[in-house]
Amino acid sequence: MRVPKKERQTELQHTIEQNPFITDEALATHFNVSIQTIRLDRMEMKIPELRERIKHVATERLDDVRTLTENEVIGDMIDLKLDTSAISILEILPEHAFSRNAIARGHILFAQANSLAIALIDDELALTTKANVQFTRSVHVGERVVAKAFVSSHRQDGRSDINVESFVGDECVFIGEFTVYRSSKEESK
């Protein structure tokens, strides 16, 4: 059963405030309307498209990345607390995948996780010294990969252990344990 436009728009506003990363497709399914209707509602209410919402959230939640430039981070960084945790989102595009089966190349998922682990370090120089990774399912073109990283320990030798898990929806698709060297041992906690 369709909801009246005013009521739908009020609910749409609330839904996007609760989850700014929700897609127009998911909203259309939720409200049982077309994607075009959702886009028209968003335009009428001056709610930006998903990519702009992600950038807006990112500017509010990011510490300054010290180890990498913005274009060296694979995916869109949406949350960063240096030496603590970070989150990035990567939309899998055709150029990220094998052409014959539209499955994302493993090095793309690894690069997203590795760059997130490096960006997490509060130092001018950070390098991956060890990585133990597991791919738990194939990721396909059009899927959105959310990588979540957190520092599990800071060692006396100036290295940090970082765990990264990547998800498509609620399903884990990648698990990585990274050891990252930092150049300033005295800054490690």
UniProtKB/Swiss-Prot annotation:
InterPro entries reported in the protein's UniProt record: HotDog_dom_sf, Transcription_factor_FapR, WH-like_DNA-bd_sf
Keywords: DNA-binding, Fatty acid biosynthesis, Fatty acid metabolism, Lipid biosynthesis, Lipid metabolism, Repressor, Transcription, Transcription regulation
Keyword Transcription in record: yes
SUPFAM superfamilies per UniProt: Thioesterase/thiol ester dehydrase-isomerase
BP GO annotations: fatty acid biosynthetic process; negative regulation of DNA-templated transcription; negative regulation of fatty acid biosynthetic process
Signal peptide: none
Keyword S-adenosyl-L-methionine: no
Molecular function per GO: DNA binding; DNA-binding transcription factor activity
Family classification: Belongs to the FapR family.
Function: Transcriptional factor involved in regulation of membrane lipid biosynthesis by repressing genes involved in fatty acid and phospholipid metabolism.
Name of this protein: Transcription factor FapR
Organism of provenance: Exiguobacterium sibiricum (strain DSM 17290 / CCUG 55495 / CIP 109462 / JCM 13490 / 255-15)
Lineage, broadest ranks: Bacteria, Bacillati, Bacillota, Bacilli, Bacillales
